[in-house]
From Swiss-Prot:
Disulfide bonds: none annotated. Its main location: cytoplasm. InterPro entries: Gamma_tubulin (IPR002454), Tub_FtsZ_C (IPR008280), Tubulin (IPR000217), Tubulin/FtsZ-like_C (IPR037103), Tubulin/FtsZ_2-layer-sand-dom (IPR018316), Tubulin/FtsZ_GTPase_sf (IPR036525), Tubulin_C (IPR023123), Tubulin_CS (IPR017975). One of its GO terms (cellular component) is nucleus. Signal peptide: none annotated. It comes from Zea mays. Belongs to the tubulin family. GTP binds at residues 94-100. Keywords: Cytoplasm, Cytoskeleton, GTP-binding, Microtubule, Nucleotide-binding. Tubulin is the major constituent of microtubules. The gamma chain is found at microtubule organizing centers (MTOC) such as the spindle poles, suggesting that it is involved in the minus-end nucleation of microtubule assembly. This is Tubulin gamma-3 chain.
Length: 421
């Protein structure tokens, strides 16, 4: 009952809200086989149905307009929870609704529920192909500021890497949205198994995230999953062992973020923390032996200023989902190479900003009225500082980083008392 509650007729209803500024996607859900799954009172579609036009400022402004209606739904669900621990937001950072309205919701949740955790699953745009959204760099930068300041944990879902995995690992020449989304849903499902099938450890959101995020701002996680299959491969059977799964999780080709790259600079990056969630029939002694082998072979490069250990959580498999493999694994990792993804976003932003391109689209809205573009400048500074901090994490002297004033240590520790323990 973590993610569901029972209605009077005993069927289960998700504790979820579906929010959009245009009706196409939600109408698709309401006309599908899932139409009776969701609580219809928890579905919000803007009356005008015009969307945000792929404009962050439009989405943010409409978030201000509709915040009372949306927060009424949030408050109702929160009041119906026995022990509310936090919120999970699924959104994209490139368009208008997910980025703009998502940003406003992040700020509002952080303000109204300041003691609760906010975790996001954030879809980053494809960095290789030309985007249909010409203002994508502006939208991404403005959203990244909110993800840095208002979220406690961000699971990065990188479209560039997801497409690469679909092509290279699943051998799909032209992956569909449904096939890419199945990768995302696999990650989301696996990352919540310890909450849905609680054991002795990692059975709540704080316990899951506290060890992964030792410092408040470095809370962007990358994921890896193995073995990956698509529908047509369901009948393919192979032998899976704990060591095989844990070793594969560390391979670059299985990481779902493109910044975990094949460049020389990225290869010098380090792990801040790793949590492997292993599902299936597993003997704890196998886990211990696998960790020992990984340590002996020096397969992992950890930072110098924190414990260098891979944490492992064992979880049961769902009895309702049939799989052909005995053992599967998800890696949640805090890795300094994530900064290269942010640097790409900054680089794309700088190209557009130098040309002053498409800024009139933003000046139409209150935040950017009277040619006030300070929001862009502030967002850029925050993301540059985030990139610098991830770079500093690779140094043994990171603990002293940015602490010119002795009192600053206390300020940093107080930034996020929800996670820093």
């Amino acid at each position: 009952d973590v993610f569901f509650y029972q209605a009077d007729d005993q069927h289960f209803i998700p504790r979820s809200l579906l929010i959009d500024l245009e009706p196409r996607v939600i109408n698709g859900i309401q006309n599908s086989e899932y139409r009776n799954l969701y609580n219809h009172e928890n579905i919000f579609v803007a009356e005008h149905g015009g969307g945000a036009g792929n404009n962050w400022a439009s989405g943010y402004h409409q978030g201000e307009q509709f915040v009372d209606d949306i927060m009424d739904m949030v408050d109702r669900e929160a009041d119906g929870s026995d022990s509310l621990e936090g919120f999970v937001l699924c959104h994209s950072i490139a368009g208008g609704t997910g980025s703009g309205m998502g940003s406003y919701l992040l700020e509002t949740l952080n303000d109204r529920y300041s003691k609760k955790l906010v975790q996001t699953y954030s879809v980053f745009p494809n960095q290789v192909e030309t985007s249909d959204v010409v203002v994508q760099p502006y939208n991404s930068l403005l959203t990244l500021k909110r993800l840095t300041l208002n979220a406690d944990c961000v699971v990065v879902l990188d479209n560039t890497a997801l497409n690469r995995i679909a092509v290279e690992r699943l051998h799909l020449s032209n992956p569909t949205f449904a096939q890419t989304n199945s990768l995302v849903s696999t990650v989301m499902s696996a990352s919540t198994t310890t909450l849905r099938y609680p054991g002795y450890m990692n059975n709540d959101l704080v316990g899951l995230l506290a060890s992964l995020i030792p410092t408040p701002r470095c809370h962007f996680l990358m994921t890896g999953y193995t073995p990956l299959t698509v529908e047509r491969q369901v009948n393919m059977i192979r032998k899976t062992t704990v060591l095989d799964v844990m070793r594969r999780l560390l391979q670059t080709k299985n990481i779902m973020v493109s910044s975990y790259a094949r460049t020389k600079e990225a290869s010098q990056a380090k792990y801040i923390s790793i949590l492997n969630i292993i599902q299936g029939e597993v003997d704890p002694t196998q886990v211990h032996e696998s960790l020992q082998r990984i340590r002996e072979r020096k397969l992992v490069n950890f930072i110098d200023w924190a414990p260098a250990s891979i944490q492992v959580a064992l979880s049961r498999k769902s009895p309702y989902v049939q799989t052909t493999h005995r053992v599967s694994g998800l890696m949640l990792a805090n890795h300094t190479s994530i900064r290269h993804l942010f640097s790409k976003c900054l680089g794309q932003y700088e190209k557009l900003r130098k040309k002053q391109a498409f800024l009139d689209n933003y000046r139409k809205f209150p935040m950017f009225a009277d040619n006030d573009l300070s929001e862009f400048d502030e967002s850029r500074e925050i993301i540059e500082s985030l990139v610098d901090e991830y770079k500093a994490c690779e140094s043994p002297d990171y603990i002293k980083w940015g602490m010119e004033d002795p009192g600053e240590a206390n300020v940093v520790a107080a930034l996020d008392s929800k996670l820093v323990v």
